[in-house]
UniProtKB/Swiss-Prot annotation:
Keywords: Activator, ATP-binding, Chromatin regulator, DNA damage, DNA repair, Helicase, Hydrolase, Nucleotide-binding, Nucleus, rRNA processing, Transcription, Transcription regulation. This is RuvB-like helicase 2. SUPFAM superfamilies: P-loop containing nucleoside triphosphate hydrolases. DNA helicase which participates in several chromatin remodeling complexes, including the SWR1 and the INO80 complexes. The SWR1 complex mediates the ATP-dependent exchange of histone H2A for the H2A variant HZT1 leading to transcriptional regulation of selected genes by chromatin remodeling. The INO80 complex remodels chromatin by shifting nucleosomes and is involved in DNA repair. Also involved in pre-rRNA processing. It catalyses: ATP + H2O = ADP + phosphate + H(+). ATP binds at residues 76-83.
Length: 476
């Protein structure tokens, strides 16, 4: 994704492109074929074949509507693609299925209680497709006549509109005249008018006017003149989440809170009434419930009260699929004194189906770094890519991925568009990975403030520097 920003140092105020590249912006799906078999490298996903195959089964069940109120735990070491798996699932589901991503630490807030924050996250992940029949007037504009008063008072007008089979003249009031003026509707445009709201939508320009000698923009779209009756009934489907309905009904002008984010605590009575109404709409065929996915990253950060709430919420009538990710092994459950696998209570683990991820091999790391370099528009020499791959295997994939953009800046400093081995080595020396940083702190721990607030102030100013070439040879 790129946006245009102005350069403050440029007196001419020229615009430059700013690329917004996230850690998982290169992922467009799970990389599966029609039989749910994972490809080695596809749609930005590399390796983790068993985990992607399992996620593909979950994807198919979600699309068929045969799974809801289930808990899925993705467990594995750091930098093994757990969040990437969730993002791939989100992209594969498409826009029609709600997908809400939060982290475990987001639940704790001074404004909202833990249960309220979780409830809102749950209800954001449940979509409601509401069907509505509307009457539309669709046709090609033949002529627009607008009579304006000299004193600037009431305006009157006539709109002549036609299809291939009929032609009609409509009287226009102030609101319709303003709408036509706002949309810049001219003779030859194909428009759609919602009779209930008076909303005017410009569909395009008629093919009959395509040969007219007239100035038009590059985005002008030519469409066929509509056939049949002018007035048509059309079924429109609106997709909203349960949380949006909650906010709108929780207070006067509640829809404004959707934009400000100041939702506050929503009373349970409001939610009960909405649940009853949605159930009625479902029985009458007016609405369809779409169970979505709630992804909780770093789920081990939740405490025992949150886990207890999730256990109960999974059994609710309106429950989404909960996907959780953690990199913990046997660790203490927050809010308790006992240890459990992945830092989760055993009763929640019993309710979950668990997907495991494993460390990437060298070839997979190389493929991922190649994809990241393409996403960041960085040209790597083969030797530099091999060195980054080796660094990723010895340190971590995240560290090696971060070195790509740093090494690019070093290469640009010497006026080169290609990142060479020397650029990667300089970046490696400038920025420590976690293991070298830990060793540096251990060797100089007397100079840091400890738990008791004690520190040894050195007057010589000498500190042990981290070893430069422990993971690679940095000599040029």
């Amino acid at each position: 994704m790129s946006i245009q920003t102005s350069d403050p140092n440029d007196p001419n105020g020229s615009l430059k492109s700013l690329s917004l590249i996230a850690a998982h912006s290169h992922i467009t799906g799970l990389g599966l074929d029609d039989n749910l078999q994972p490809r080695a490298s596809s749609e930005g996903m590399v390796g983790q074949l068993q985990a992607r195959r399992a996620a593909g089964v979950i994807l198919r069940m979600i699309q068929n509507g045969s799974i809801a109120g289930r808990a899925i735990l993705v467990a594995g070491p750091p930098s093994t693609g757990k969040t990437a798996l969730a993002m791939g699932l989100s992209q594969s589901l498409g826009k029609d299925v709600p997908f809400t991503a939060i982290t475990g630490s987001e639940i704790f807030s001074l404004e909202l209680s833990k249960t309220e924050a979780l409830t809102q996250a749950f209800r954001k992940s449940i979509g409601i497709k509401i069907k509505e029949e509307t009457e539309l007037i669709e046709g090609e504009v033949v002529e627009i006549q607008i009579d304006r008063s000299i004193t600037g008072g009431h305006k009157q007008g006539k709109l002549t509109i036609k299809t291939t089979d009929m032609e009609t003249i409509y009287e226009l009031g102030n609101k319709m005249i303003d709408g036509l003026t706002k949309e810049k509707v001219l003779a030859g445009d194909v428009i759609s008018i919602d009779k209930a709201s008076g909303k005017i939508t410009k569909l395009g320009r008629s093919f009959a006017r395509s040969r007219d000698y007239d100035a038009m923009g590059y985005d002008t779209k030519f469409v066929q003149c509509p056939e049949g009756e002018l007035q048509k009934r059309k079924t429109v489907v609106h997709t909203v989440s349960l949380h949006e309905i909650d906010v709108i009904n929780s207070r006067t002008q509640g829809f404004l809170a959707l934009f400000t984010g100041d939702t506050g605590e929503i009373r349970s009575e409001v939610r009960d009434q909405i649940n009853t109404k949605v159930a009625e709409w479902k029985e009458e065929g007016k609405a369809e419930i779409v169970p979505g996915v709630l992804f909780i990253d770093e789920v081990h950060m939740l405490d025992i009260e949150c886990f207890s709430f999730i256990n109960r919420a999974l059994e609710d009538e309106f429950a989404p699929i909960i996907m959780m990710a953690t990199n913990r092994g046997i660790s203490k459950t927050r809010g308790t004194n006992y240890k459990s696998p992945h830092g989760l209570p055993l009763d929640l683990l019993d309710r979950s189906i668990i997907i495991t991820t494993s460390n990437y091999n060298e070839e997979e790391i190389k493929t991922i770094l190649t994809i990241r370099a393409q996403e960041e528009e960085v040209e790597l020499s083969p030797d530099a890519l091999d060195l980054l791959t080796k660094t990723g295997g010895e340190t971590s994939l995240r560290y090696s991925s971060n070195l790509i953009s740093v090494a690019q800046q070093i290469a640009l400093k010497r006026k080169s568009n290609t990142v060479e081995v020397a650029d990667v080595k300089k970046a490696y020396l400038l920025f420590l990975d976690s293991s070298r940083s830990v060793k540096f702190v251990q060797e100089n721990q007397d100079q840091y403030i400890d738990d008791n607030g004690k520190v040894i102030i050195s007057t010589s100013g000498e500190m042990t520097q981290p070893a430069d070439g422990e993971a690679m040879d940095t000599t040029e």
